[in-house]
A protein has these predicted regions:
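Conserved N-terminal structural module of periplasmic/extracytoplasmic solute-binding proteins
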Residues: 2-113, 124-128, 174, 339, ...
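Extracytoplasmic/periplasmic substrate-recognition and gating elements
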Residues: 66, 252-254, 295-363
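Short helix-initiation/N-cap motifs at beta->coil->alpha
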Residues: 76-85, 178-183, 259-271
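Hinge/lid segment of periplasmic solute-binding proteins
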Residues: 104-158, 182
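Short, solvent-exposed loop/beta-turn-alpha elements that line the ligand-binding surface or hinge
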Residues: 120-133, 200, 217-241, 295-299, ...
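Extracytoplasmic/periplasmic solute-binding protein
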Residues: 146-152, 158, 182-235
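C-terminal capping/gating helix-and-loop segments adjacent to ligand/active sites or protein-protein/ligand interfaces
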Residues: 151, 227, 324, 366-374, ...
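Glycine-centered hinge/linker elements that transmit conformational signals in sensory
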Residues: 187, 228-260
Length: 441
């Protein structure tokens, strides 16, 4: 998705007071400064937990071993905590050297505030590095035609996972349409099995349902109008229809009881699927690696199934399209020293595009953003990797997750309204009115 049409209000102009300073102190790093040991020490913040944290740490260890005169120091945070801490740090001018993110609207706010380095010329001078990265992943790292973030790690479509053993036990088949999903809900409930696992407290997990239902109902144009800042874009009739579908799912008990108190960071939603307490789950492709790591023999024994989210009968959307994260991204803080920026660029041009990096993500069950990865799709994970690669490459449109495509200000309002929608605290029309009020911010 091109970022050149973004027009967002800058959230970084806010003053960070004592609360911000306290939050920074809790982060365990002093921000953009280098250590006083004679080495240039570049700071790297990213997400904790499997499967990503061990791979990120392994990359840093490889780099530090190969470059003894420099050092990269990593600090890891859970997903939701990271989003707040990185926002606070950047607003205070205390960002780490390397800023991990999802691109899109969040990156645009950093660019507007001159907080990140323009990498366009660097990639021009290092064409061999750029050629090792899938071209389609650069869109979310590009703002106004310039590259401000390097695509890293994996392509992550959102998919529908299901527990094959539960389906066999109940005697039903995987859904081929949204109508099939609706038919399955009472059948699983009758057997005391939740139709869908959902970590509703995290909010962005709920958002996946809105993204797919709107796309399958109306195609990409409605959200494209929102993204472009068109006034009252959320008032499209397809949005009200989608929101009504969501609330009907809640009323029909499509989701695990107590979903609004379950967090994604705890991986409790994953456990509900692999333990058979839930039959299905809409989640990111990274879920596979979590279930391999935490689910015992579940995946290896053939218990996990997956598919692209099915189409809606009569809908305008193409069921081959997908949504999710076209990649993850690393930017370089413009407030960091020249020496630390040089360390980051060397990390970009060597370790992050080496064969070990590619192999690490494949082994985790991920499809790397790096080219020529298909030859590594072997062993127990081969079919999953091929299928995720096919979904990502076969989609005419691979839309970026809404909360990443929009500005952080709008994204927070979006997520708050989504939580209220799932808790039946607001009506579809109230949701539309609230979201129309922040379009273009």
């Amino acid at each position: 998705m091109s970022q050149s049409s973004l027009s967002r209000r800058n959230f970084l102009g806010l003053t960070v007071g004592a609360a911000g300073a306290a939050a920074l102190a809790a982060c365990g790093t002093s921000g953009p400064s280098s250590a006083g040991s004679g080495k240039s020490t570049a700071a790297y913040w990213s997400l904790s937990g499997p499967p990503g944290q061990p791979i990120r740490q392994a990359a840093i260890d490889r780099f530090n071993k190969a470059n003894p005169s420099t050092k990269i120091k990593a600090t890891f945070f859970q997903n939701d905590a990271y989003k707040q801490k990185i926002k606070t740090a950047i607003g205070a001018g205390q960002a780490p050297t390397m800023i991990w993110g999802w691109g899109g609207g969040g990156l645009k706010t950093y660019v507007d505030a001159n907080q990140v380095v323009d990498l366009t010329d660097w990639f021009g001078q290092n064409a061999a590095v750029k050629q090792k990265i899938l071209p389609s992943t650069f869109g979310a790292g590009t703002v106004n035609g310039k590259i401000y973030a390097m695509p890293i790690e994996t392509v992550q479509p959102i998919v529908l996972f299901y527990n094959k053993k539960v389906f066999d036990r109940v005697g039903v088949q995987p859904p081929q349409s949204y109508g099939d999903i609706l038919d399955l809900i009472p059948k699983f409930n009758a057997k005391g099995i939740a139709p869908f696992s959902l970590a509703g407290q995290s909010r962005w997990t709920n958002m996946m349902w809105l993204e797919f239902l709107l796309d399958r109902q109306a195609g990409p144009d409605v959200f494209n109008n929102v993204f472009a800042g068109q006034a009252d874009a959320w008032s499209d009739p397809a949005v009200l229809e989608m929101l009504t579908k969501v609330q009907n799912l809640v009323k029909d008990k499509a989701f695990i009881k107590g979903f609004s108190s379950i967090t994604a960071d705890s991986n409790a939603d994953q456990a509900l699927l692999y333990t058979g307490k839930a039959a299905m789950m809409v989640h990111g492709s990274w879920s596979y690696g979590i279930q391999v790591a935490n689910g015992g023999n579940f995946v290896k024994s053939g218990g996990l199934g997956w598919m692209n989210f099915p189409g809606i009968d009569g809908g305008k959307g193409d069921p081959s399209d997908t949504v999710g994260n076209p990649g993850q991204y690393l930017s370089i803080s413009s407030k960091s020293s020249a020496a630390d920026q040089a360390v980051a660029k060397k990390f970009f041009s060597t370790t992050l595009v080496d064969d070990a990096e590619k192999a690490g993500w494949v082994k985790s069950g991920g499809v790397p953003v790096l080219t020529d990865s298909a030859s590594l799709f072997t062993g127990d994970d081969a079919q999953y990797l091929k299928d995720m690669s096919a979904i990502a490459s076969g989609a005419k449109i691979f839309a970026q997750s809404w909360d990443q495509a929009l500005s952080p200000t709008v994204a927070e309002t979006l997520l708050d309204n989504i939580a209220k929608l799932f808790q039946l605290q607001i009506s579809p029309q109230q949701w539309v009115d609230s979201m129309n009020g922040v379009i273009g911010q």
